[in-house]
A protein has these predicted regions:
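ABC ATP-binding cassette signature C-motif
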Residues: 1-200
């Protein structure tokens, strides 16, 4: 039986008089991890926004299975809780709100210390604030990860940790990164945006 997966069918998108995609088709397989490549301005981030429902498209169809959860790394740095630990726990389901172990494991993996957990999220540098958002994303355990330049601001140990996490992640991944070594080490396929289409 065919497992229902996210699917793009005959997708077309123009932007400012320029055609980014024309009749693009994509059907992900379970566990597939795709590295998306293409020159700047080719539409990689726009494709992410279309999948997330944040950007309209001219024609075609985006099919997302019911209850299929897509997670993406937010660049907006808005924090409401007094400590890093409590901020990250916000994303947990109500019955897991106090499962700090799950949160702490992710925070430690991304370079936070035990002392950091009780600090104000706003007291950290922009790079570490992005990591807090990355922890919040990973803690939600989505079916699919859309990661746009997730290696920015990461030091070597955190990079290694994220690499291991993505490799072990059981869901689907589409990744945009300029770090080709990182991409090659975590993806199963590379897909290019070329001549207004997607090519594996």
């Amino acid at each position: 039986m065919d497992i229902q997966m996210i699917q793009l069918t005959n997708l077309s998108k123009s932007f400012g008089g320029q055609t980014l995609f024309q009749d693009v088709n994509l059907k992900l397989s379970p566990g597939q991890k795709i590295g998306l490549v293409g020159r700047n301005g080719s539409g990689k981030s726009t494709l992410f926004k279309i999948i997330l429902g944040e950007e309209s498209y001219d024609s075609g169809d985006v099919s997302i299975p019911k209850n299929y959860m897509i997670g993406t790394l937010k660049q907006h740095l808005v924090f409401t809780e007094p400590t890093v630990r409590e901020e990250c726990a916000l994303v947990l389901p109500e019955d897991e709100q106090w499962n700090f172990y799950k949160i702490e494991k992710l925070l430690f993996g991304l370079g936070f210390t035990a002392e950091d957990l009780d600090k104000d999220p706003m007291s950290f540098s922009g790079g570490y604030q992005i990591r807090i958002n990355l922890v919040k994303l990973l803690a939600t355990e989505p079916n699919m990860l859309l990661l746009d330049e997730p290696t920015n601001y990461l030091d070597l140990p955190s990079l290694r940790w994220l690499k291991g996490f993505i490799k072990e992640f059981e869901g689907e991944v589409i990744l945009i990164t300029h770090d080709r070594d990182f991409m090659d080490s975590v993806t199963t396929h590379t897909m290019g945006i070329q001549r207004k289409g997607l090519r594996l």
